[in-house]
C-alpha cells in the first residue's frame, strides 16, 4: 500500500492511499458471485453466467463501485495507521484513479485530532459545594416523606385549608355561556396542587362542605383552547366533602410499615442515615471529579478545536440517549410524540455542552497519553466482566461488540480520571 499525508491547514489534511490489485481481484470476484445470481442473460440460467460474458456485456467496471465499498473501510483504516495520524471525523473520499489492472488510488480529506498542550492536572485545588455530612434533619425529612405517603384522607369538619382535598361539582361559563370541558361531577381536587387554572383552588380555601362558591378566574393567554385564552370565566362550584390528610403516628409501627426489614424507628433512622451517607459520599466524589477535571481542562490549551468534533459529539450523545430510551421500550418516534419534540430539538439540546464535553475528552486522553497509561490483560477481562454485569449481557457478547482497542482506551481514560481526581485537594 502506498500512503502519503499532506497537511492543508491546522487539523486538516489530504490522505492519499492505494488499494492493490491483490486486494481488488478477490473483491471483484466476490461482487461478481453475488450479483450474477440476479442477472438474466439469454442463453444462460441465472447464477450460471460466465465472467467473460458478463465483462463483454456489462464491462468489469460495473463491479468496481461495490468492490470499492467493500474494500474502502479496511484500506482507509490501514492508511490512517501507516500515516501515523489520528482522525476525528468522517472523511470525504475522492477516487483519483480506478484503472483496469492498476492499483486504485483514493484521496481522503480528513480532520485530525487537535494538539493539546496540557497545563497542571495533578494536585489541583478545587472547591465543591457538596458535603458528606448527614444531618438529623435530612434523616427526619426522609422519614416524614414516607410518613406522608402512608397518610389517609379522612372527612373533615369545618372549612377547607390549603393541602386539603375537596370533592366538588363545577360548571364553567364565559359571559353566561357554558363551554366544552368546563363541567365536572364528584371531582377530587387537592387544594394547592395546581391541577386547575391559577386562582381556582385558592378561592375554595375557607369554605365548607355544602357550600356553593362562584369561582371567577381568567384563562392564561397561552391556554391550549384558543377560544378561551385570556377570557374571564365563572365556575359555579358545589363542595360535597372536605378531606384532610391523617398521617400515622411516628412510632415503631410506622417504621415497620415503611420498611419490613426494620423493627423500630431507631433502626429505620440508622438505615436511612447509612443510605444517605453512601449517596452523599458518591455525590461528593462526583463533585470533586467534575471540579478537578474542569480545572485540568481550563489549564490546558487546545489548538483550533475542529467543528466536526463537536458535531460528532452531538450525534454520539443523541444516539446514546435514544439507545437508552429504546432499551426501556420507548422508540425514538414514541419519545418524540410523548415529549412533543423533534430530532432537531434533541440535537439542539445536546449542542449546548457538546464543545465542553469534547474538550474534556481531549484533555483526559492527553493526560492518559502523557502518563503512559495502558491496560493489562487482567484489566481488560475485568472491564468486560463489569460491562456484561452492568448491561445484563453475556461476556462473549460484550467482546463481540467492543474491540480490544476500545477497551484499552476506556481503561486508560478511567486511569487518567482517577489520577486527576485522587490527587486533587478540596479547599
Swiss-Prot record:
Ranges in a coiled coil: none
A Gene Ontology BP annotation from the UniProt entry: cell division
Keywords assigned by UniProt, alphabetized: Cell cycle, Cell division, Chaperone, Cytoplasm, Isomerase, Rotamase
Alphabetical list of InterPro entries matching this protein: PPIase_dom_sf (IPR046357), PPIase_FKBP_dom (IPR001179), Trig_fac (IPR005215), Trigger_fac_C (IPR008880), Trigger_fac_C_sf (IPR037041), Trigger_fac_ribosome-bd_bac (IPR008881), Trigger_fac_ribosome-bd_sf (IPR036611), Trigger_fact/SurA_dom_sf (IPR027304)
Enzyme Commission number, as recorded: 5.2.1.8
MF-aspect GO terms: peptidyl-prolyl cis-trans isomerase activity; protein folding chaperone; ribosome binding
Keyword Cell cycle: yes
Keyword Transferase: no
Protein localization: Cytoplasm
Pfam families, per database record: FKBP_C, Trigger_C, Trigger_N
Gene Ontology cellular component terms for the protein in this record: cytoplasm
Catalytic activities: [protein]-peptidylproline (omega=180) = [protein]-peptidylproline (omega=0)
Domain annotation PPIase FKBP-type: ranges: 163-248
Swiss-Prot/TrEMBL domain comment: Consists of 3 domains; the N-terminus binds the ribosome, the middle domain has PPIase activity, while the C-terminus has intrinsic chaperone activity on its own.
Function, as annotated: Involved in protein export. Acts as a chaperone by maintaining the newly synthesized protein in an open conformation. Functions as a peptidyl-prolyl cis-trans isomerase.
Record-stated family: Belongs to the FKBP-type PPIase family. Tig subfamily.
Protein name per Swiss-Prot or TrEMBL: Trigger factor
UniProt organism field: Streptococcus sanguinis (strain SK36)
